[in-house]
C-alpha cells in the first residue's frame, strides 16, 4: 500500500462548495461520475453511483455513510479529478481479486479517505455546512406561519405553524411523529409519510395492505402510528443527528456488522408460505447483539421492581406493602382505602395524575401552583391535601400513560377492589386474543404518550 502527496490547490473550489447555504432541503440532484460522463440522480441513485465507482473505476470512498452532504462532496472531487489522476489524491492498494470477486494478481484499487488533509478539511466543512443549514431551516420552520397542508388522515387543512399540524396529527389521530422543537425538514418528512400512506404502507413496519381501513386498523392495534426509529432514512429529520461525531467501531461491533452483512441477503426474503417479509428481523437495532427478545435472564425473580417511589416525596419503598405503610404513616394516605372503589384502569389514572401534579409542583387536591417543592410539601401537609384528587381531575384518557419512565408503582397495582366488568368497559377482539379493556384506553396506544 502506498500513498502519494496530494497536489496543492483546490482551496477556492472547496470554499465554493462549502460556502453557500440553502434554506430549503435539496431535492433530486444530478451528480456526474468522478471519472466518466455517467450521471446519477441523488439521493435515489446513490448506491448505484458508489457501485459504479468501485466496479468501473476501482475507487472506494472511506466512511461514505458518515459524509455530510455527499452530493457536495462528490461534486468537489469531480472537479479535482477532472484535471488530476486518482494517484495524486488517493491511497493506492493492490489486491488479488477483481471487483466482481474473481481471482487476479495485483489488481490496483484507490481509496479516497480523510488521511488526506484536503479530504479531511472538506468533510469537516461539509459537516459544519450541513449543521448550519439544518439550524437555519429549523428556526424557519418553528416561526413560519405560511404553512398550509391537508391532514394525512382527514380532509382538514391546517394553516399556520407546523407545530399546529403535528399537534393535530397527535390530538386527533394519535400519530406521533415527533416534537416540533426536535424535528427539521418537516415538510419533506410529511411528504414522505403521505407517500407511504397513499401506497397503503404501514409507517412503522412498512407492510402493504389491501385498503386504507385495513391499514388504519393494523396501525392502531399494533401500535404502529409512529415512524420506525431504526430506519436510517429518518435520521435527517431529527436535529440531534446533525452534531453527532461518528466513533470508531470496536472489535465487537465490527464482528456484529459482519454478521449483519452475512444475514442481510436473506433477512428480506419473503416467507414462501405467507409471502410476507420479516421486517422485525431486517430492521433490528444496529446495537443489538443478535440475541432473541425472549431472553428474560435479567428479569427480577419475584416480578416486582427493586424499589418503588412514593407518590408525594422522594422516598423509595422496598416493596408495595412498605410503600403503602410509608404513605399512611408519613402522608396520612391509606392508598388501599382511597382506591378501594376503583378498578385497575382508574388506579393507573390516579397514579399518573399524582405523578404529574407533583412534577409540575401543583397540589393534588386544590391544584394550587408553587414555585418550590418545599412550599408544595408544606402546603399539602398543613392542609391535609395528601389525597388522590377529584375524579374529574384524573379520569382522563391522557392519564393512561406513565408520566415518569419505568414507574415501579404501575407494575404492582392489582385488579382487586372495585372492578366491575359492566362499568365503563367494552369487550373487543384483538389480533392475538380476546381482551377486556376500558373504552378510553381502547382508543389510545402507548406511543401516544409524549415523553418529557
Curated annotation (Swiss-Prot):
Zinc finger (C2H2-type) in chain: 200-224, 361-385
User: Could you tell me where this protein is found in the cell?
Assistant: Nucleus; Cytoplasm
Keyword field:
Cytoplasm, DNA-binding, Metal-binding, Nucleus, Repeat, Transcription, Zinc, Zinc-finger
Q: Where is the composition biased (Basic residues)?
A: 252-261
The GO annotation for biological process reads: positive regulation of gene expression
Which residue intervals make up region (Disordered)?
248-271
GO terms (molecular function) for this protein are: chromatin binding; DNA binding; zinc ion binding
Q: By its UniProt entry, which SUPFAM superfamilies does this protein fall under? A: beta-beta-alpha zinc fingers (SSF57667)
Where is it found, in Gene Ontology cellular component terms?
A: chromatin; cytoplasm; nucleus
InterPro entries with a match to the protein in the record: ZN622/Rei1/Reh1_Znf-C2H2, ZNF277, Znf_C2H2_sf, Znf_C2H2_type
Q: Report the function annotation for this chain.
A: DNA binding protein which is involved in the positive regulation of both basal and inducible transcription. Mainly localizes to active promoter sites and interacts with components of various transcription and replication regulatory complexes, such as the ORC, SAGA, THO, TFIID and SWI/SNF complexes. It may therefore regulate transcription by promoting the association of these complexes to their binding sites.
Q: Which family does it belong to?
A: Belongs to the ZNF277 family.
Quaternary structure, per UniProt, is: Interacts with components of the origin recognition complex (ORC) complex, Orc2 and Orc3, components of the SAGA transcription coactivator-HAT complex, Gcn5 and e(y)2, components of the mRNP biogenesis THO complex, thoc5 and e(y)2, and a component of the TFIID complex, TBP. Also interacts with polybromo, a component of the chromatin remodeling SWI/SNF complex.
Q: What is this protein called?
A: Zinc finger protein 277
Species name for this entry? Answer: Drosophila melanogaster
Species classification:
Eukaryota, Metazoa, Ecdysozoa, Arthropoda, Hexapoda
Amino acid at each position: 500500500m502506498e500513498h502519494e502527496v496530494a497536489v496543492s490547490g483546490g482551496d477556492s473550489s472547496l470554499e465554493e462548495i462549502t460556502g453557500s447555504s440553502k434554506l430549503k432541503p435539496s431535492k433530486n440532484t444530478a451528480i456526474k461520475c468522478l471519472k466518466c460522463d455517467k450521471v446519477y440522480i441523488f439521493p435515489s441513485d446513490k448506491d448505484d453511483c458508489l457501485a459504479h465507482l468501485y466496479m468501473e473505476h476501482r475507487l472506494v470512498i472511506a466512511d461514505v455513510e458518515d459524509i455530510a452532504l455527499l452530493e457536495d462532496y462528490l461534486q468537489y472531487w469531480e472537479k479535482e479529478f477532472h484535471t488530476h489522476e486518482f494517484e495524486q489524491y488517493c491511497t493506492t492498494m493492490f489486491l488479488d481479486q477483481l471487483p466482481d470477486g474473481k481471482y487476479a494478481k495485483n489488481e490496483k484499487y484507490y481509496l479516497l479517505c480523510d488521511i488526506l488533509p484536503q479530504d479531511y478539511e472538506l468533510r469537516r466543512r461539509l459537516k459544519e455546512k450541513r449543521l448550519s443549514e439544518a439550524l437555519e431551516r429549523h428556526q424557519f420552520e418553528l416561526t413560519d406561519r405560511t404553512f398550509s397542508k391537508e391532514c394525512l388522515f382527514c380532509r382538514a387543512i391546517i394553516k399556520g405553524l407546523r407545530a399546529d399540524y403535528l399537534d393535530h396529527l397527535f390530538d386527533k389521530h394519535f400519530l406521533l411523529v415527533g416534537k416540533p422543537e426536535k424535528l427539521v425538514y418537516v415538510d419533506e418528512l410529511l411528504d414522505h409519510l403521505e407517500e407511504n400512506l397513499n401506497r397503503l404502507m404501514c409507517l412503522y413496519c412498512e407492510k402493504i395492505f389491501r385498503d386504507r381501513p385495513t391499514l388504519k386498523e393494523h396501525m392502531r392495534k399494533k401500535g404502529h402510528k409512529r415512524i420506525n426509529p431504526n430506519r436510517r432514512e429518518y435520521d435527517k429529520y431529527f436535529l440531534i443527528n446533525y452534531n453527532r461525531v461518528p466513533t470508531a467501531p470496536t472489535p465487537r461491533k465490527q464482528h456484529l456488522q459482519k454478521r449483519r452483512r452475512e444475514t442481510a441477503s436473506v433477512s428480506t426474503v419473503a416467507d414462501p408460505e405467507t409471502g410476507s417479509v420479516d421486517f422485525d428481523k431486517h430492521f433490528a437495532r444496529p446495537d443489538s447483539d443478535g440475541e432473541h427478545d425472549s431472553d428474560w435472564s435479567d428479569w427480577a425473580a419475584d416480578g416486582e421492581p427493586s424499589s418503588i417511589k412514593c407518590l408525594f416525596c422522594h422516598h423509595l419503598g422496598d416493596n408495595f406493602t412498605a410503600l403503602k405503610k410509608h404513605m399512611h404513616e408519613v402522608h396520612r394516605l391509606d392508598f388501599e382505602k382511597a382506591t378501594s372503589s376503583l378498578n385497575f384502569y382508574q388506579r393507573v389514572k390516579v397514579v399518573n395524575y399524582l405523578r404529574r401534579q407533583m412534577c409540575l409542583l401543583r397540589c393534588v387536591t386544590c391544584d394550587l401552583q408553587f414555585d418550590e417543592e418545599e412550599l408544595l410539601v408544606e402546603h399539602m401537609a398543613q392542609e391535609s391535601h395528601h389525597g388522590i384528587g377529584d375524579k374529574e381531575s384524573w379520569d382522563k384518557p391522557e392519564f393512561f400513560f406513565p408520566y415518569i419512565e419505568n414507574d415501579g408503582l404501575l407494575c404492582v397495582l392489582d385488579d382487586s377492589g372495585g372492578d366491575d366488568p359492566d362499568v365503563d368497559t367494552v369487550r373487543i377482539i384483538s389480533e392475538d386474543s380476546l381482551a377486556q379493556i376500558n373504552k378510553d384506553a381502547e382508543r389510545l396506544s402507548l406511543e401516544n404518550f409524549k415523553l418529557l
